[in-house]
Swiss-Prot record:
Protein name per Swiss-Prot or TrEMBL: Urease subunit beta
Subunit structure: Heterotrimer of UreA (gamma), UreB (beta) and UreC (alpha) subunits. Three heterotrimers associate to form the active enzyme.
Enzyme Commission number: 3.5.1.5
Keywords: Cytoplasm, Hydrolase
Organism (species): Rhodopseudomonas palustris (strain BisB5)
Listed CDD domains: Urease_beta
Recorded metabolic or biological pathway in which this protein acts: Nitrogen metabolism; urea degradation; CO(2) and NH(3) from urea (urease route): step 1/1
Enzyme superclass (EC): hydrolase
One Gene Ontology term from the biological process aspect of the record: urea catabolic process
Catalytic activity: urea + 2 H2O + H(+) = hydrogencarbonate + 2 NH4(+)
Amino acid sequence: MIPGEFLIEDGEIELNAGRATVTLSVANAGDRPIQVGSHYHFFETNPALKFDRKKARGMRLDIAAGTAVRFEPGQTREVQLVALAGKRVVYGFRGDVMGKLDKA
């Protein structure tokens, strides 16, 4: 093995299998590009992104960890979101939730 070498098996890797998803149309109504990372709570993204925020609550982009989606000014694109897993508690971001996503 060479240092830093990856040994990848043949086949497909399925991301987020069995998790709830939703597809939304998202438009950047701002005058600057907006980039959203893979694990950002999509509900709390920049207000210049226009989409159905209620459907995005408790969701993140359904993309590989460490990647992002960029929205250029005036651009509209479809994105698939996936439900956050784990304890489903959200703190930080824009401070819109600051606690449990699900009602007790």
